[in-house]
Amino acid sequence: MAAAMRVAVAGARLSVVLRSLRGAGRSLCTQPVSVNERIENKRQAALLGGGQRRIDAQHKRGKLTARERISLLLDPGSFVESDMFVEHRCADFGMAADKNKFPGDSVVTGRGRINGRLVYVFSQDFTVFGGSLSGAHAQKICKIMDQALTVGAPVIGLNDSGGARIQEGVESLAGYADIFLRNVTASGVIPQISLIMGPCAGGAVYSPALTDFTFMVKDTSYLFITGPDVVKSVTNEDVTQEELGGARTHTTMSGVAHRAFENDVDALCNLREFFNYLPLSNQDPAPVLECHDPSDRLVPELDTIVPLESTKAYNMVDIIHAVVDEREFFEIMPNYAKNIIVGFARMNGRTVGIVGNQPKVASGCLDINSSVKGARFVRFCDSFNIPLITFVDVPGFLPGTAQEYGGIIRHGAKLLYAFAEATVPKVTVITRKAYGGAYDVMSSKHLCGDTNYAWPTAEIAVMGAKGAVEIIFKGHENVEAAQAEYIEKFANPFPAAVRGFVDDIIQPSSTRARICCDLDVLASKKVQRPWRKHANIPL
């Protein structure tokens, strides 16, 4: 119902924008005019972009224009545009002709608000030279990124570009590098979000790759370094744009993109919702929303959610939904490395980052992709002071030559490093298995977890009973009795609890209440670490 209302509101706002653009086209004047009239004519020309014919072509592709996208993303009337009159400076290949000059060039830039909170935005205009990046285009983007860093506000890029403007040669490449430098400078200081709403190829792909989150639109957005024609000429592979760099490819196979949405309107509405979880900068807290879900709410269904059989799967997402405010969970990368779950939720109105093993996929084992996915998310949360809640059910790291040859040792160390490095409040709940090195990695007490809980169903041990018995009781006649002895001594929460490695063994139904209470206490947490230029994470 809420989603339908958002789409309806977005549709109404879009119709207003379309009427204003049609009016802009009719108001253009070719007669000699005063300075004020020239200013107004330039302004109207900028609003029209590449012209009505190209706007219509954009709509026929199922895509909105650059300005329509900004209008739907930002609060009504909040957009303040900058550099509307900037034009490209290229004089080669006939580019100096008036017909090839467009006020604002091929990108719309400025600032506005999302639910009243400041944000800087650029939206590439495919109706002007296919949204290609010129020196002026890059200059406009760099200017708002500099402003965003100065005031401490996020940057959102709406990407829809054919790539570098070939007519400008190396100046276009220099423009990309200028943007990349600012992406790196802003990393960990202000949130950076890329929404791919059309083609994004060649050097252009590295800016989204450097931002914190990359979202795509199904069927109309593409990300690749070299297109299908080049791939065919070099490797003789036949591949379509969609197969090579479409939303499905990057959200399920490569892990380059974090989520994909049905269309432009759906993407922009979800981006507004997602933005509400984030702080404006690393100096500002994430917004605290009024919470009507009692912080001390008990969740009785959690007492029976973990099966008695340790090999039987269950859905960790059900536990997450049951614990967080209003059952609302914005999952990140839901279709990639499904054996680990990451995303944002709220606890008592505060934004939290959620990490959890997924027993339904590969029994929740950690592998290369899930380790990298989890590490990237944990580091973002730590950069922006977002508390971490970790739900653990992990039997270990996935064995096999593919994992070893792929570098599971190095990649698994990334997740370990991320949790150990994080100084935000860290609350861990072991729901069932926590075996071997994977127990250590998943925000254990040994990696400075602030509060670590175990459910009565927890099994905290070096390995499972079957494998342990084969080593400890090798040649033992009664294997079942040996396994029962091992489980009694080790595969339960008590050995860890008596050593202080978990702070308490709690009833699952009390999990929400305990976490909310802990987060209140940990809100003032401060940690001092030794000075260093920067850490050397095992990339």
Curated annotation (Swiss-Prot):
Record keywords: Acetylation, ATP-binding, Ligase, Mitochondrion, Nucleotide-binding, Phosphoprotein, Transit peptide
Record domain CoA carboxyltransferase N-terminal: where: 32-290
Chain positions found as Phosphoserine: 71
Origin species: Bos taurus
Region (Carboxyltransferase): 32-533
Region (Acyl-CoA binding): 325-358
Gene: PCCB
Compartments where located: Mitochondrion matrix
N6-succinyllysine modified-residue sites: 99, 474, 489
Catalyzed reactions per annotation: propanoyl-CoA + hydrogencarbonate + ATP = (S)-methylmalonyl-CoA + ADP + phosphate + H(+); butanoyl-CoA + hydrogencarbonate + ATP = (2S)-ethylmalonyl-CoA + ADP + phosphate + H(+)
Name the UniProt record assigns to this protein: Propionyl-CoA carboxylase beta chain, mitochondrial
